[in-house]
């Protein structure tokens, strides 16, 4: 975990150092239809054992590079005023407990960003897609290598410039094979994360 913190701190400091202009406090970033966002987030997965049959304490670091495109102008005229973005994300998880194993997936993604607060922009996101892991057969909750991962969460973006933002947030992850093989109790976890995005 300290290694992830050092990486994110270094990246955030680097983005600040490369900013060549002073960002006015009263200036809002302009995100229009067609604006693309490339981001990288990292966090640490913490297990949830929702039933007595869930016995595995899977946990470990996660890395999530992503690409998105804004597909709407701001909608609404109150606190919920916001924009919709669509895109995709890769996810890599290194499970460090109870065994050192790995998982990798690809998830289409949708995000709704609230724009009423100018540079500070809360958002909600949802993603889901195929996920491969070598946990299969090593824990009672998973019986197949091919699975699906579903993710729902929220976060906050703070725009350092018109094109650079720092992000922090929380996700709930569910990993299972969708009933294609049994047993299929699935894995559930919290994933607090931090990262950055570039817009162009």
Segments the model singles out, each with a brief description of its role:
Residues 36-46, 86-92, 124-130, 168-172:
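Transmembrane beta-barrel strands of outer-membrane/channel proteins
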